[in-house]
Amino acid sequence: MGYSTISNDNDIKVCVIMVGLPARGKSFISQKIIRYLSWLSIKAKCFNVGNYRRDVSGNVPMDAEFFNFENTDNFKLRELAAQNAIKDIVNFFTKEDGSVAVFDATNSTRKRRKWLKDICEKNNIQPMFLESWSNDHELIINNAKDIGSTSPDYENSEPHVAEADFLERIRQYERFYEPLDPQKDKDMTFIKLVNIIEEVVINKIRTYLESRIVFYVMNIRPKPKYIWLSRHGESIYNVEKKIGGDSSLSERGFQYAKKLEQLVKESAGEINLTVWTSTLKRTQQTANYLPYKKLQWKALDELDAGVCDGMTYEEIEKEYPEDFKARDNDKYEYRYRGGESYRDVVIRLEPVIMELERQENVLIITHQAVLRCIYAYFMNVPQEESPWMSIPLHTLIKLEPRAYGTKVTKIKANIPAVSTYKEKGTSQVGELSQSSTKLHQLLNDSPLEDKF
């Protein structure tokens, strides 16, 4: 019997319509919502009106003057972009069986919002408005700098020029902006975030799926931060090619543990952070030399291999051949006898993800399957690909969430370690080919480099 999702059970279709001036974190929040829901197996997609605007505008300059509401020609182009986006959203629900769409734009006037609400309701889609309102000058400037360096509108501009132009764009929108109001908009379903979480206004949230979205956005913090991911150092079980267990580190694993602080400081300097580990010995030993506050999470323990715990893949293939084949055929859904599947791990990781979104700088030291699930969340990796990603030992992965994606930096410790990666169709471990997924390639490209 197959799994069902929240959206399958209730046939809910929700369109989250973003509201807010530029540089308030709307695109960041939009992308986070999509990644979160997709990670939970809910079919969701973001429709960024800026992309549609660039498509319909041709060679028209995207400077601040383009957003002058009194420029009728450019206003018509922006309206056309919005029309194309909402048309695609309707098709996403009616032809692709989507569950949640995010309409990512300023939607700064009540007239625009009513137009969107009417279209959604006409097509049996539940509109849910989400406003990010802020007068936090520091946050706005930081967001403007981030957008100036990452937005496609400014790909050929110097950072200081892009920032100045973007601030002028904000001023154009401020002239006509109408924020959501609990009285004037009392008949609408909406959530309003004031200065991120200083105040949260919730109005007419009716469904379970809407409440899940509300709970999630109340936990995210669109502020600059770093997240480091690392497997424990090489363990004795790794050397013996066994899975699971609670073995100690090998000699090389202890070498990695002693070098980990240096790797973190080289990537970010002197910085305050918290270290999260699982309850298993090998992660705690890896964190032992770090001078930071430490927190253990049972939810970060390795995927439970059930009856196969402590066995090699060769032994599993010999003793449980049908299970071995079934896991290769559907690694995300397959559950070890008496153990867990990758889907089970995702479910138990949800509280970890929520708390991770609330925190600032965190170093997570955990296990291969768990890191695959966490990395898949931040990088929006499809379910069928995530269990096949290679997360090598003795490698620190630095994630930097940004407005238009997550910046990834891979830092190798240059301390040898065995490979525990098993490709599909074999019981042997080790990097046998380059035929795996794009994320396999991403995490195995050599020299240190930054990627989006």
From Swiss-Prot:
Residues reported in the UniProt entry to bind beta-D-fructose 6-phosphate: 53, 78, 106, 112, 169, 173
Entries under SUPFAM superfamilies matching the protein: P-loop containing nucleoside triphosphate hydrolases, Phosphoglycerate mutase-like
GO molecular function, one term: ATP binding
Catalytic-site annotation from UniProt: 104, 232, 302
Stretch list, region Fructose-2,6-bisphosphatase: 224-452
Function of the molecule: Monofunctional, high-specificity fructose-2,6-bisphosphatase, which releases phosphate from the 2-position of fructose 2,6-bisphosphate. Has no detectable 6-phosphofructo-2-kinase activity.
UniProt protein name: Fructose-2,6-bisphosphatase
Organism field: Saccharomyces cerevisiae (strain ATCC 204508 / S288c)
